From Swiss-Prot:
Location of the protein in the cell: Membrane
Gene3D superfamilies: Glycerol uptake facilitator protein
Domain of life: Eukaryota
Transmembrane segments: 53-73, 88-108, 136-156, 176-196, 203-223, 245-265
Gene source species: Gibberella zeae (strain ATCC MYA-4620 / CBS 123657 / FGSC 9075 / NRRL 31084 / PH-1)
The protein, known as: Probable aquaporin-3
Keyword Iron found: no
Phenotype seen when the gene is deleted: Leads to no variable phenotypes.
Domain comment in the entry: Aquaporins contain two tandem repeats each containing three membrane-spanning domains and a pore-forming loop with the signature motif Asn-Pro-Ala (NPA). FgAQP3 has NPA/NPV motifs which is in accordance with the fungal aquaporins (NPx and NxA).
Amino acid sequence: MADTYGMNGHNGHVKDRRSSSMNGRNRLYAQQEPQRTTHLSEFGKHMVAASGEFVGTFLFLYFGYAGNIVAVLQEPISGPNGTLANNTVMYIAMAYGFSLLVNVWTFYRISGGLFNPAVTFGLCLSGQLPWIRALFLFPSQIIAAMCAGGLVNAMFPGSASIANTTLGPNTSIAQGVFLEMFFTAQLVFVVLMLAAEKSRDTFLAPVGIGLALFVALIPGVFVTGGSANPVRSFGCAVGSRDFPGYHWIYWVGPLLGAALAAGYFRLVKMMHYEEANPGQDSPVDV
């Protein structure tokens, strides 16, 4: 017992040497750990994100507009009062919803896959995106929408005006604003809860985001043309050079919806919503 710390008569020297050796080895391992190198400046990071946002927004809207135009041109039968038939409405909603799903899943690691000034605005208001990044993303989204509208107008039969968002019969301008507000609030809140708020379901966020737009456009295509995205309405209007007099509602409504979603997101975060229904992110076999 007397020799417990003496290491059999060596007065602890063996232990000291061993400890010293282990400490040296730990320092060696620490030095050999790969260091994360940064190749981009802050400005460079913003520019890369802006480039991804431009390409992603362009592809999302190009295929959305294309699907919209093809659906209308191929449908010989219209609904009452010259409105779109139900199967055409579903086709258009799927064109935008699935185009968003695919491109968000593709570009979220580059830019976040926002493709929408209202979503960008909502993320900034909720504290999930720096305003400086938004200043780079907004112009990318707007320019990409203009390019998509112009190319679709040039490459497809008919005109990009077929994809314009217009109010449905008996839908007033005031109703249009509030409808667009709620359609966009649905979309933005899904983005906040599935993508911005990290959980075990985050990897499926693109699916939820695409389906959220699809769900919003099922009624939206009939009553407002189905925007939920200012540049979705702006791009085809620029491409066809055909702006409805109430085009502004497709900016005001979605931005209000983004603010509504961001406000509720901040509220439930402040109230620690995780404690209201605990265990949702526990392993499924626990």
